[in-house]
Amino acid sequence: LLIGNKIYKRKQKKQDKITFTTMIITLQKLNIPFLPILDSDIWNKHVSFKAGNKYHIKASSGSGKSTLIQSLYGIQKNYTGDVLFNQKNIKQFSVEETCEWRASKISIVFQDLKLFEDKTALENIDIKRALTNTYTSEKMHEFAEQLGVSHTLNRPIQTLSYGERQRIAIIRALMQPFTVLLLDEPFSHLDQHNIQLASKLIAQELQLRNATLLLTDLEDDNHFQYHQKFSL
């Protein structure tokens, strides 16, 4: 299992079939002790994100945007309140359940991307693809062509521009099965043309999987047809 830029092994099943089941996320009075919470649509509220819907969360610097995303992904646990996926508290997941959940139910693009700097772009993507066996290598190359990064695939990540790295991270996130996609400022270093290309590809994959999208950003945007917008 790939978590950020670390690899963990999980038990292999004889048949690792991909099933896209719906998932509802519920936040119950979620709060971060070290954050000054003022007027927020999320913190210390009861909020539900419905399966298959797209949500935009506008957040200023220092309001806990990345902390929220990391809490939803289960790597930030310094909070009060509850994060529920289909009514199950993620703090109560066993190690095996967490690995299976991250491998088949939830995918993420971190703000800092968490790519392997010394690996090529292709290797970074293929680690996720090979671990989950969701898409063929041909499909991965098709995504790279769509996002205009085919020419970067055999280059080390450390030689790529940040915008190119963001597109590689997006492709990597799409290489696994998921019912929830978390995007933390995914387009911050992309121009409008490349944002349109990336958002089109993401929207196609969301529709295919009937997946929920949670996107955080510093500003409002209309990259997707959002069902609801929040201010953090």
Which positions does each model-derived feature cover?
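Q-loop/switch helix immediately C-terminal to the Walker
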Residues: D112, D118-L131
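Helix-to-loop junction immediately C-terminal to a conserved catalytic motif
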Residues: Y73
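Conserved ABC transporter NBD signature motif
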Residues: G81-Q92
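Conserved ABC ATPase signature
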Residues: P156-E164
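Conserved ABC ATPase "signature" region
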Residues: S137-T152
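ABC ATPase NBD coupling module
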Residues: I90-S107
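Catalytic Walker B motif of ABC-type/P-loop ATPase nucleotide-binding domains
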Residues: L181-E185
